A protein has these predicted regions:
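Mature N-terminal, pre-catalytic/accessory segment of carbohydrate-active enzymes
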Residues: 17-122, 126, 142-156, 466-467, ...
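Aromatic-Pro/Gly-enriched surface loop or interdomain linker
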Residues: 56-64, 322-468, 705, 731
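Active-site clefts of carbohydrate-active enzymes
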Residues: 217-219, 238-269, 295-299, 336-342
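Carbohydrate-binding surface patches
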Residues: 373-412, 467, 489, 593-625, ...
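Substrate-binding cleft/loops of secretory-pathway carbohydrate-active enzymes
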Residues: 137-145, 191-236, 258-267
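Helical hinge/lid and interdomain linker segments adjacent to catalytic or ligand-binding clefts
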Residues: 86-96, 107-114, 118-121, 418-517, ...
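A glycine-rich, often tryptophan-bearing local segment used as a flexible ligand/cofactor-contacting loop or short
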Residues: 478-563
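Catalytic beta-strand/loop cores that center a nucleophilic Ser/Cys/Thr
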Residues: 507, 539-602, 614-619, 642-693
Length: 737
C-alpha cells in the first residue's frame, strides 16, 4: 500500500511511510523548477461554476472503501480492522435505499472505479474519487462518460511540508519552502488535468491550502475536524473561492476519526449533525462524510467500538504481515470475525451515522441549500509565507522544520502562530458546548462571518479587496514586499479599513521575527503613503498599555485600566501627515507613547499596532481592572474592527450595539442571493437569545437548544450587494453561486 493511500485511510500523516512519501515527492518534482511568480502567471483552466443538484442544491456524500475482513494496522491504541460486509454493489444499493446522500466518493482505481461510477449514475448518484489512479486513458473515459455526474479527482493529503525529512535542495527560507511545495502541487495538478480527470480537488487539514489553490487546485475541501475550527475552515475555503473564482468549495468531514469526544458524551452524534448544518449555512456546496456510515475505522476516542476488537500487536510499528507474526494474526483474525458486527454497517454506531446523513439529505430536499455565498464583509488576512498551522502547537515547527529550528528556534511555533489564536478567540469564540469535553471544532459568529483572504505570493489585488471587504485584519505571519505594500495602500486610500502591525510590514523570509529592525521593514520603515509616518527606531520597553483619556474611547479603553504585561519597545515615529489624521487609541501608561494609532488615509484608515512584535505579544491582560472574560488589548481591537464592517444583517444583545454572552453561542449567516438568514444555536442544553438586526429592523430571537432556524430576509440584486464576486458560466448554465 503506497504512502498516500495509507495516509488517507487513517487521516493521520504519521501513518504515511517515509519511503513512499519520498517517492511521491520525487514523482511530483518537475524537471525545471519554477518561481512562485512563474507558477502564478501560468493560465488556469477556464472556470465553469459547478452545477448543483436541483433538489438539494448540495452534493452530500460519503467515502466508499473496500471491506476486506483484515487488519490494516496494529498497536495498543491504533489497531484498525476492516470488516467483511458490504460489497461495492451493496453499498450503492443501500445508499439509495436509505437516502444516505446523493454522492459517493470512491477510493478505487481504473476499471473498478469506472464500473462503480457507472452504476452510481444509473442509480441517480454523483461520483468523485480520492487517491485514485488510472491508466490507458481511463481517467478521460470516466470523466467524459459520466458527464455532470462526475465531480472530479481529489488528491487528498498528498502534499505536506512535514512528511519529508530530507532537506536537500529545499532551501532554508520560507520562500524557498513555499516554492518547492508549489512546484510539486503544480506538476501533479497538471498531470491530473492532462490525464482527463476534470476538476482537481484538495482535501487536507493543513493551513497551506491556499498555496495548493495558488498552484492550480480548483476545489478546496478542507478536512474538517482535524483542521480544528470548522467555521475558520469555511472562511479559508470561501475566501479562496472568491479570490480565485473557483468552481465551488466543499468540506470533508472526518468526524469519526477526529471528533475525539467519546461515545459516552450524549452529543457525540449531534456534533456530526451540527457540522452538516454549519457547512450548509457557511456556503459549502459539497459535503463528504469520510467514514463511519458504511463501516467504522477510527480508534481516536477512548470508547470507540474499534477498541473492543482484538489487539495482537503492542506496537503500531510491528510488521503485521511478517512470517513470524502470522500465527498471531491468524488467531486474532478468527476472533475478529466474531466481532465484525461491532464495526460494520450493521453496528449501532454506523446506523447512527447513516441516520444523520439521511436526515440531513431529507432536510435539504425540503430546504435546498441557499444560493450563492453568505455575506462576509470583513476578512482575516493570511499573510504571505504564513506556512504555519491554524492553531498554536508549542512543540510544532513551521513546515516541520525541526532541523532548522535547532539553529534558529524561531522556526518553532511562536508569537506569529499565537496571533491566530488571538484573533479567533476575540471574534470567533468556541463555547463550552460539549462539557465536560472540550469544544475545539465549533465557533460562533457573534461578529458575523468573515473570509480568510490569502496574500500567498501577493496574488491579490486592491480591487478584489475593495470589492469584497470593508475591513482586513492581519494576525499571523506576513512577509511584506513593495508589491504588497502598494496593494495595501490602494486598498486603504480606496476606502478600506486595515488592521496591521509593525511585524506584518517586515520583509523577513527566515523567521527572524524576534530581531526586527527598521532596515528589514518594507521601504525601510517609510510608511508615509500607508500611514502618514516613518518608523525611525524603537523606544525603550513599555510595560503597560492604557486608554489615552479618562473617558472611554471607541475600544472601550479608559486611562488607568492597564493592559499587560507588555515588555515591548514601541515604534519611534516621524509624522508627515496632518495631526488631525491621527487618533491614539491605546498608549503606554508612563509617557503616553502610542500602542495603537488610527491613521486616516484617503477614504479609508489604518488601525496600526505600533510595537516591534506580532499581535499576540501585546495581548496579555492581567493588569489593573482586568476581568475574567476580557480578551486583551488586541482582542478588543479586532472586535472593534469587526463591528466597523457590519453588513446588512447582524446580531447583538439587548443593548442593540454589542454582541452579548448569548451571541457567543450563536452562528448566523445571511445569503443575499437567497434572501434568507440562517441561525444555529450551538448550545445543546439551553435557549439562547439575540436581537437579529436586518435592513434596519430588529427582531427578538429565542433559539431552542441546538435549534437551526431559517428566517426570511431580503433578496438583493447584484448591484445592491455589499460584496460581489465574479462568475463564469457555460452557455445555458444557470448561476448558482
Amino acid at each position: 500500500m503506497n504512502g498516500s493511500v495509507l495516509c488517507g485511510l487513517f487521516c493521520f500523516c504519521a501513518f504515511a511511510a517515509a519511503g513512499a512519501a519520498d517517492d511521491a515527492r520525487l514523482v511530483d518534482t518537475p524537471a525545471k523548477r519554477l518561481s512562485a511568480e512563474e507558477i502564478i502567471s501560468k493560465p488556469r483552466p477556464k472556470t465553469v461554476k459547478m452545477r448543483v443538484p436541483d433538489d438539494t442544491r448540495l452534493y452530500i456524500g460519503s467515502g466508499v472503501y473496500e471491506n476486506c475482513g483484515r487488519m490494516y494496522a496494529g498497536g495498543f491504541c491504533f489497531t484498525y480492522w476492516s470488516p467483511e460486509k458490504l460489497n461495492y454493489d451493496e453499498v450503492l444499493d443501500l445508499c439509495v435505499k436509505e437516502g444516505v446522500g446523493n454522492t459517493l466518493q470512491f477510493w478505487q482505481s481504473n476499471r473498478t472505479l469506472l464500473e462503480l461510477a457507472r452504476k452510481a449514475k444509473k442509480l441517480g448518484l454523483y461520483s468523485t474519487c480520492i487517491y485514485s489512479t488510472a491508466t490507458n486513458g481511463m481517467a478521460a473515459k470516466i470523466s467524459s462518460e459520466l458527464g455532470q455526474s462526475w465531480l472530479g479527482h481529489d488528491f487528498g493529503e498528498r502534499f505536506s511540508f512535514s512528511l519529508y525529512t530530507d532537506w536537500k535542495d529545499r532551501g532554508v527560507t520560507l520562500r524557498a519552502l513555499a516554492e518547492e511545495y508549489m512546484n510539486r502541487v503544480h506538476k501533479h495538478v497538471n498531470d491530473l488535468h492532462a490525464a482527463g480527470w476534470g476538476n482537481v480537488m484538495a482535501t487536507s487539514a493543513n493551513f497551506s491550502l491556499d498555496y495548493e489553490v495558488a498552484a492550480g487546485t480548483e476545489i478546496p475541501c478542507t478536512e474538517d475536524f482535524p483542521f480544528g475550527d470548522l467555521t475558520l475552515a469555511s472562511a479559508l475555503s470561501r475566501g479562496l473561492y472568491r479570490q480565485y473564482n473557483l468552481p465551488m468549495w466543499g468540506a470533508h468531514l472526518a468526524h469519526e476519526w477526529y471528533s475525539w469526544i467519546p461515545h459516552k458524551n450524549p452529543y457525540k452524534m449531534k456534533t456530526l449533525e451540527t457540522a452538516f448544518y454549519l457547512k450548509y449555512m457557511t456556503g459549502a456546496k459539497l459535503i463528504i462524510n469520510e467514514s463511519g456510515n458504511w463501516q467504522l475505522q477510527s480508534s481516536l476516542c477512548e470508547d470507540s467500538p474499534m477498541s473492543l476488537m482484538p489487539k495482537p500487536f503492542r506496537k503500531m510499528s510491528d510488521k503485521i504481515s511478517s512470517p513470524e507474526n502470522r500465527p498471531l494474526l491468524e488467531a486474532a483474525s478468527a476472533e475478529a470475525k466474531k466481532k465484525f458486527s461491532y464495526i460494520d454497517y450493521r453496528s449501532p454506531v454506523a446506523r447512527k451515522y447513516r441516520k444523520v446523513i439521511s436526515d440531513f439529505t431529507a432536510f435539504c430536499r425540503k430546504h435546498p441549500a441557499p444560493k450563492g455565498q453568505p455575506e462576509a464583509t470583513w476578512a482575516i488576512a493570511k499573510g504571505n509565507l504564513d506556512l504555519g498551522g491554524a492553531s498554536y502547537v508549542p512543540g510544532g515547527a513551521v513546515c516541520g522544520a525541526y532541523d532548522l529550528a535547532k539553529k534558529n528556534p524561531n522556526w518553532m511555533n511562536g508569537i506569529p502562530e499565537m496571533s491566530w489564536e488571538t484573533v479567533r478567540k476575540a471574534v470567533m469564540p468556541m463555547p463550552p458546548m460539549l462539557a465536560p469535553n472540550k469544544n475545539i471544532h465549533f465557533s460562533a459568529s457573534p461578529y458575523g462571518l468573515c473570509d480568510i483572504v490569502s496574500f500567498a505570493c501577493d496574488n491579490v489585488t486592491a480591487e478584489h479587496l475593495l470589492k469584497n471587504y470593508k475591513v482586513i485584519m492581519f494576525a499571523g505571519w506576513n512577509t511584506c514586499s513593495p508589491k504588497q505594500y502598494k496593494i495595501l495602500c490602494d486598498y486603504v486610500k480606496g476606502g478600506g479599513k486595515l488592521v496591521i502591525g509593525m511585524a506584518h510590514l517586515s520583509t523577513d523570509e527566515e523567521r527572524n521575527y524576534t530581531n526586527l529592525s527598521v532596515e528589514k521593514l518594507v521601504n525601510k520603515g517609510d510608511f508615509t503613503e500607508l500611514c502618514g509616518f516613518k518608523v525611525v527606531g524603537e523606544t525603550s520597553r513599555k510595560y503597560w498599555a492604557t486608554g489615552p483619556s479618562t473617558e472611554k474611547n471607541c475600544l472601550g479603553f479608559v486611562a488607568r485600566r492597564r493592559f499587560g504585561y507588555m515588555c515591548l519597545p514601541l515604534g519611534k515615529l516621524e509624522f508627515s501627515a496632518p495631526k488631525e489624521n491621527f487618533e491614539e487609541l491605546a498608549v503606554d501608561d508612563e509617557d503616553a507613547e502610542p500602542f495603537i494609532l488610527r491613521c486616516k488615509n484617503g477614504k479609508g484608515e489604518v488601525l496600526f499596532m505600533n510595537w516591534w512584535a506580532y499581535p499576540a505579544a501585546a495581548n496579555m491582560d492581567v493588569g489593573c481592572g482586568s476581568e475574567i472574560e476580557d480578551v486583551g488589548m488586541v482582542g478588543y481591537l479586532y472586535r472593534y474592527a469587526a463591528k466597523l464592517a457590519r453588513g446588512n444583517v447582524y446580531i447583538t444583545g439587548r443593548d442593540f450595539d454589542n454582541p452579548d454572552e448569548d451571541c457567543g453561542w450563536i452562528l448566523y449567516s445571511y445569503f443575499p442571493d437567497e434572501g434568507k438568514v440562517y441561525l444555529l444555536n450551538l448550545d445543546y442544553e439551553r435557549e439562547r437569545k439575540c436581537v437579529l438586526q436586518q435592513f434596519g429592523d430588529k427582531d427578538f430571537i429565542t433559539l431552542k437548544p441546538g435549534e437551526f432556524r431559517i428566517v426570511e430576509s431580503v433578496k438583493l440584486d447584484a448591484d445592491e450587494k455589499l460584496v460581489t464576486y465574479s462568475t463564469v458560466l457555460s452557455p445555458g448554465d444557470k448561476a448558482i453561486f
